[in-house]
Amino acid sequence: MSLLTEVETPTRNGWECKCSDSSDPLVIAASIIGILHLILWILDRLFFKCIYRRLKYGLKRGPSTEGVPESMREEYRQEQQSAVDVDDGHFVNIELE
């Protein structure tokens, strides 16, 4: 006995489903969950770079500047920027022949 004969049977007009309990709440819930899962999977594949970059770097913020005078905030920003700026002399150019 094959699964094909239990679920669907070929007729002259095409394939016909033999399951008559499609109005069962469990079947409806499973269908909705399946459709939502498919939609979320497609969105994840389309926007995975944005989503995971947001999760990775969006939660990591600098220290709180609440209650710190503006002059100290500007000094901190300049220190952070100077730490990011790198002198080109530190790089070694490698040429492949």
UniProtKB/Swiss-Prot annotation:
**Pfam families with a match to the protein in the record:** Flu_M2
List the residue(s) that the UniProt entry marks as the site Essential for channel activity, possibly by being protonated during channel activation, and by forming the channel gate and the selective filter: 37
Q: How is its activity regulated?
A: The M2 protein from most influenza A strains is inhibited by amantadine and rimantadine, resulting in viral uncoating incapacity. Emergence of amantadine-resistant variants is usually rapid.
Q: Which residues lie on this side of the membrane: Virion surface?
A: 1-22
Cite the ranges annotated as topological domain Intravirion. 44-97
Q: Please report the name of this protein according to its UniProt entry.
A: Matrix protein 2
Q: Which family does it belong to?
A: Belongs to the influenza viruses matrix protein M2 family.
One of its GO biological process terms is: symbiont genome entry into host cell via pore formation in plasma membrane
Question: Could you tell me the membrane topology recorded for this protein?
Answer: Single-pass type III membrane protein
Organism encoding this protein:
Influenza A virus (strain A/Mallard/New York/6750/1978 H2N2)
Kindly give the Gene3D superfamilies that the UniProt entry links to this protein: 6.10.250.1640
Its subcellular locations are:
Virion membrane; Host apical cell membrane
Function, in words: Forms a proton-selective ion channel that is necessary for the efficient release of the viral genome during virus entry. After attaching to the cell surface, the virion enters the cell by endocytosis. Acidification of the endosome triggers M2 ion channel activity.
Which proteins does it associate with, and in what oligomeric form?
Answer: Homotetramer; composed of two disulfide-linked dimers held together by non-covalent interactions. May interact with matrix protein 1.
Q: Which residues carry this modification: Phosphoserine?
A: 64, 82
